Amino acid sequence: MANPFLSIIIANYNYGSMIGATIESVINQDCDDYELIIVDGGSKDNSVEVIKQYEKNIAWWVSEPDKGQSNAFNKGFSHARGEFITWLNADDILLPGTISAVKAALTSKPSADYATGNFVRFLNSDYTISEAKWGPHYLPYWLQGKGRYSVTFGPTTFWRRSVYEKLGPIDESLHYTMDTEYWARMMMAGHKQVRVNHYCWGFRMHEDSKTAEFGAHERSLKIKQTMDAEHDYIKKKTGYNPTAFWRYMGLAMRVLDGSAFRAIYNSKYIVGKKLTEYFEIKHKL
């Protein structure tokens, strides 16, 4: 059997009430050129029972204690066979048409090593979209490179498995910014990206999510301090620290390609709508 185009790794711990929707968001895609891998960290809720309901759709899965989210993703990537890889949090969803859009973008730009798309945040309570992030339509190679401009949004990034094998695993010492560190590593190594003009990722906002920790003021300050320390660590480790010049060049490109105006329009038009009003979601949430 030929290797799939994409390997999707879901990391889960005690999200039995949500992982079913996450899995369904993958298996309901309009492109089946993928494999699904699930790494459960030894959940104590009904997660395993839910995962077993979808075993026929899963290439490989395991439930055992791990060392955290990054460790779980690395474990999943070690079993991946796809040409490209990505991750998905067990409480989020892959939005409709994502795999097709990513495949089209990467096929049109075979020299690219990774693709990045856009995302929305939605409230778990009533599925209202609370934020819509739309990046640049086009990112020319001259704007990319060491210390230049980068636009990457978490699990909206899909990169070559060969790049992962070359750069090594995700840094498991980071709690909040492990994705930022990895994208910095890719850029500093000279790998180029192609933009996907599509909403790829639905980020579910709920009280148990990692970003929900930004609620209480004291807790927010502590988390900000942790994130600032992690960003300083990333700069020292990777050397990635874009100058103001390249940031302004990136903003200028966004004005020229129209994506800055699209982002403003989308934030006005989409935010406040129900997720199911804007996207053709055929599965449970």
Task: Describe the role of every protein-language-model region.
Residues 17-20, 45-53, 93, 97:
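Acidic helix N-cap motif at the loop->helix transition within catalytic regions
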Residues 25, 32, 40-49, 89:
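A conserved acidic beta->alpha catalytic loop
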Residues 4-7, 35, 181:
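Cell-envelope/extracellular polymer assembly enzymes that use nucleotide-activated donors
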Residues 64-80:
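Glycine-rich, basic loop-to-helix element that forms the pyrophosphate-binding segment
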Residues 85:
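Short aromatic/hydrophobic "clamp" motif used to bind/position activated sugar donors
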Residues 97-130:
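Conserved donor NDP-sugar-binding/catalytic core segment of glycosyltransferases
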Residues 136-223:
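Conserved nucleotide-sugar donor-binding catalytic segment
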Residues 1-27:
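N-proximal low-complexity "stem/linker" segments adjacent to membrane-targeting elements
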